[in-house]
């Protein structure tokens, strides 16, 4: 979620099966739908990996990232959103698109991640509200409770003023860019790094 868009109250899907579709978003304070420019860059990065992937959007908000992934033929998406009104709008948008390979979970992301999962994910979006120290905690829970498949790709979007952002040694930095007040990065989780270290 980059800048808050208060004028249109819509999110536009850039490409894929729902290309150029505009969907309503619930106007909440602090909601920052990721801009078209940033999303286009991100999904260029993911172009060879998105089709058939299991996707987890930890802070869904407007659904801009999860819906874009589904439009580009991700196999399944789980979208976590704390605010009930925003979660309900996401469910309505999925119904409008007649999308049946997604779920919206109205829950606190950190609490849900702490419960663990029976099935890992291939692509994870971490785009939390800014200035709340959530990105680092989210990373820790993803690792502790085994949410990531090996070679999973993890997208992290934070405020550019964040002093530091630490990731596990098993996360390889692939891409990093800045757009205005937003810094966004792509990592890949490589479990074999941990296994190799353990045997040395």
Language-model features and meaning:
Residues 1-200:
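Class I S-adenosyl-L-methionine-dependent methyltransferase catalytic core
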